[in-house]
């Protein structure tokens, strides 16, 4: 999710003068200031596009930004401001890329460490931290960083929980993120995407993964405040205990087991 792909014509109307806020100067180089109408059009357009093709990472990212303002992203920033590590993240604003994380170094870390668990998950799923879309539609620069940090931390959440990038795994993680961060885009996916599931997928989701996601998301500490770059050598199971996160059942194995019972 949130990965960059070629720009879509679906969002071309945003370039029209009535949707761009010409009275609002750019707050950072990539910033695209929008009018209220522009933000609404962006949310509706990306929302429909995401529902019909949830693999479109650009639309998922755009929907997240369009629905995070004017309230939810500020609440998430407040969570960071209340935490010493969160405040330091806001002050230092580190970015996570394959270069800054040094993936080759992570591959040589101790088995079971956060760094090793993370890079093994990346290799297994065939993804890279370099494909995260740049935030464009959040007006406040600090809040834009909060959204960027959330976006770049997403694969660490995957690695920590063990959830794969297949649709059921993404949706379970989105439900967890909604319960933990309050960002509405994750909640919308949690509610609407199951409508496209097959009966067995829907049963797994509602019986196992949604209850897991809500329980762990609400009870765990705010994951936005984890300084991942500084805990790479920490044992993954220890960090799960510190955060209050239980791993869900292995989704791919559960699918195999259910297929054998046919």
From Swiss-Prot:
This is Ubiquinone biosynthesis protein COQ4, mitochondrial. This protein may be expected to contain an N-terminal transit peptide but none has been predicted. It catalyses: a 4-hydroxy-3-methoxy-5-(all-trans-polyprenyl)benzoate + H(+) = a 2-methoxy-6-(all-trans-polyprenyl)phenol + CO2. GO terms for biological process: ubiquinone biosynthetic process. InterPro entries: Coq4, Coq4_euk. The lineage of its organism: Eukaryota, Fungi, Dikarya, Ascomycota, Saccharomycotina. Its EC number is 4.1.1.130. Its main location: mitochondrion. Pathway: Cofactor biosynthesis; ubiquinone biosynthesis. It is an enzyme of class 4 (lyase). It is a peripheral membrane protein. Component of a multi-subunit COQ enzyme complex, composed of at least COQ3, COQ4, COQ5, COQ6, COQ7 and COQ9. The keyword Secreted does not apply. It is found in: Mitochondrion inner membrane. Lyase that catalyzes the C1-decarboxylation of 4-hydroxy-3-methoxy-5-(all-trans-polyprenyl)benzoic acid into 2-methoxy-6-(all-trans-polyprenyl)phenol during ubiquinone biosynthesis. The gene is COQ4. Keywords: Lyase, Membrane, Metal-binding, Mitochondrion, Mitochondrion inner membrane, Ubiquinone biosynthesis, Zinc. Residues 243-262 are annotated as: Disordered. Belongs to the COQ4 family. It comes from Yarrowia lipolytica (strain CLIB 122 / E 150) (Yeast).
């Amino acid at each position: 999710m949130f990965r960059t792909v070629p720009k879509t014509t679906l969002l071309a109307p945003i370039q029209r003068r009535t949707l761009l806020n010409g009275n609002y100067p750019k707050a950072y180089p990539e910033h695209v200031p929008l009018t209220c109408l522009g933000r609404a059009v962006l949310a509706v357009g990306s929302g429909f596009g995401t529902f019909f093709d949830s693999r479109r990472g650009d639309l998922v990212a755009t929907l997240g930004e369009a629905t995070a303002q004017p309230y939810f992203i500020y609440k998430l920033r407040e969570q960071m401001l209340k935490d010493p590590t969160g405040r330091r993240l806001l002050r230092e604003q580190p970015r996570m890329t394959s270069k800054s994380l040094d993936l080759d170094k992570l591959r040589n870390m101790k088995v079971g460490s956060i760094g090793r668990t993370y890079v093994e998950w990346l290799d297994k799923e065939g993804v890279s931290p370099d494909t995260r879309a740049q935030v464009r539609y959040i007006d406040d620069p600090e809040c834009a960083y909060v959204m960027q940090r959330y976006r770049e931390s997403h694969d660490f959440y995957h690695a920590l929980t063990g959830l794969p990038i297949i649709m059921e795994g993404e949706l379970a993680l989105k439900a967890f993120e909604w319960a933990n961060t309050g960002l509405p885009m994750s909640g919308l996916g949690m509610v609407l995407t199951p409508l496209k599931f097959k009966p067995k997928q829907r049963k797994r989701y509602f019986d196992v993964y949604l209850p897991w996601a809500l329980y762990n998301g609400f009870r765990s500490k705010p994951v936005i405040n984890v300084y991942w770059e500084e805990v790479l050598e920490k044992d993954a199971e220890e960090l799960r205990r510190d955060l209050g996160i239980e791993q869900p059942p292995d989704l791919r194995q559960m699918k195999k087991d259910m297929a054998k019972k046919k």
